[in-house]
Amino acid sequence: MRTRIAIAGGGLGGLTLARILHRHGIDTVVYDREASRSARPQGGALDLHPESGQLALAEAGLAGRFRSEARPDGEEHRILDPTGRVLVHHEPQPGSFSGRPEIDRSALRDLLLDSLPGDTVAWRHRLVAATPRPDGGWELTFHDGRRTSCDVLIGADGARSVVRSLLTDVELSYVATLVELNVEDVDQRHPDLAELVGPGNLWCVGVNQILAAQRLGDGSLRVGISLRAEDRPLDSYRSKRALLDLFAGWNPRLTALIEAAEGAPTPRLIEAMPIGTRWTSRPGVTLIGDAAHLMPPVGEGANQAMLDGAELAGHLAANPGDPNSAIRTYEEAMFSRIHPIAEMSARVQAMMLSPTAAEDIVRFFTRPAEPARAD
């Protein structure tokens, strides 16, 4: 009998999982809370790592399409101090795909969505509860009262995962505050900012705070302000005036990134799960991505979510008659893989928002490569 697989969450990890299972002839349903693929902005760009995100896309048969959408020049990054002095300027080799080329999250999500049958994603389905059925499997309840059932439930439902509670009662920790803004049509309307940021990423590093900007493929800039965790209401970050006050004394060329932004700033808490989080495997359910291992956003989250999806899909496809065994194998490997990555992410997050962040980040980006070991 066919195993009915439900994926809660249509982010990059859930869609990667669905795509690879589809390639193996295994159908799934992805339940997503959004009204459509274009219901809300998908955030900025990300760099896909060869050993994780790019590997997952290769397993999905989408490496060629990724190359057509990615921007190798988006790897360029500049690190400045509050005076505007350049501390680090990295320029990738022109046209090279040997590193970690950038791609807009929206473009990557569309690439995955376009690779799936049209009825794979059930939009407007926000999961609110999953209860075990007497004969095995799960009954799923959605926000509007609709219900359905499945044999295997995979939680790809992000930081505030509903599925996570079926496996662990772990609590999230508040580690930082992020405020996001957007600057539209930067080349035409703000050429000085276009030159400042370049084709990739800019980080302006101060004491316990960072002002960053990222070029997107649509000609806009995504501006992000990272601050240490504080006992301060999010509403206090919703005006540009309040944000400019945080950067008093900085070079006006840098704070122009805030002044040029359209619309109100969007603040949010950055949270993380405890490093080393594990759970006892439970039949018919598991987690991938942020639902499984929420980490500070330092470049690993989406990559590891996609690799989770690829590895879980591979185990399910290799053992279709025993999904519980496939889940156990996936989980043990995932726990071991994620632990050092979560430790690294926490260290980098702390380094970036420290009193000595500028010196530490320069040292991090300019450290010599480790010599190859001789066998």
Give the predicted meaning of each segment.
Residues 1-5, 20, 47-167, 171-186, ...:
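Conserved N-terminal helical subregion
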Residues 6-35, 154-155, 159, 245, ...:
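Conserved mid-domain beta->alpha element of the FAD-binding
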